[in-house]
């Protein structure tokens, strides 16, 4: 994790070009986190070109270009991860694109959950939950998939999510 102080006024657009393990960028001012796909060398410029400065010198992020990159990315699981983060933080996300992202994730949910298990990524599973893509219709299957992969942390997250979102609150007499 790299934390850049608010006092920093300028960062070179290539500052993180060689950060192979960079998975997520968080923009505190916008309240946004975006998934950064594993970049082949020839695509690194595309990600860094998403940043721009307005006339006042404020750094901004080009969400529209990010969304178009997402549509062009060849690996479906990376597209699903990018879509989950966009749904979790839908800054400047048109309704039609939101529906397309939800359909993409729903279509590839099983493969996506198995990929999350393979990488043991609670961050990606939480992104699905925060994006509203963990539904009452699919939660039991998702629990079965994470259990089959022997990922207790992920199964535990799903069980807690199920308890918080899909279980009716009944009075508990236990001590």
Predicted regions and their residues:
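Charge-dense, extended regions
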Residues: 153-175
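Ankyrin-repeat C-terminal turn/loop position
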Residues: 132-134, 163
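Structural signature of tandem-repeat unit edges
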Residues: 1-10, 20-37, 42-96, 102-119, ...
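Conserved hydrophobic site in ankyrin repeats
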Residues: 125-128, 158
């Amino acid at each position: 994790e790299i934390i850049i102080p608010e006092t920093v006024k300028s960062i070179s657009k290539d500052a993180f070009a060689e950060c192979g393990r960079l998975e997520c960028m968080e923009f505190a001012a916008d309240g946004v986190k975006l998934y950064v796909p594993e970049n082949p060398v020839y695509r690194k410029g595309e990600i860094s070109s998403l940043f721009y400065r307005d006339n006042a010198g404020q750094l901004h992020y080009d969400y529209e270009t990010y969304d178009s990159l997402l549509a062009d990315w060849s690996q479906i699981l990376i597209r699903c991860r990018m879509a989950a983060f966009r749904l979790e933080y839908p800054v400047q996300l048109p309704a039609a694109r939101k529906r397309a992202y939800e359909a993409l994730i729903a279509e590839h949910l099983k493969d996506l959950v198995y990929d999350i298990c393979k990488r043991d990524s609670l961050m990606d599973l939480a992104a699905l939950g925060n994006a509203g893509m963990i539904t009452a219709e699919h939660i039991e299957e998702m629990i079965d998939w994470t259990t089959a992969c022997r990922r207790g942390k992920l199964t535990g997250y799903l069980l807690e999510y199920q308890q918080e979102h899909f279980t009716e609150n009944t009075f508990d007499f236990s001590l």
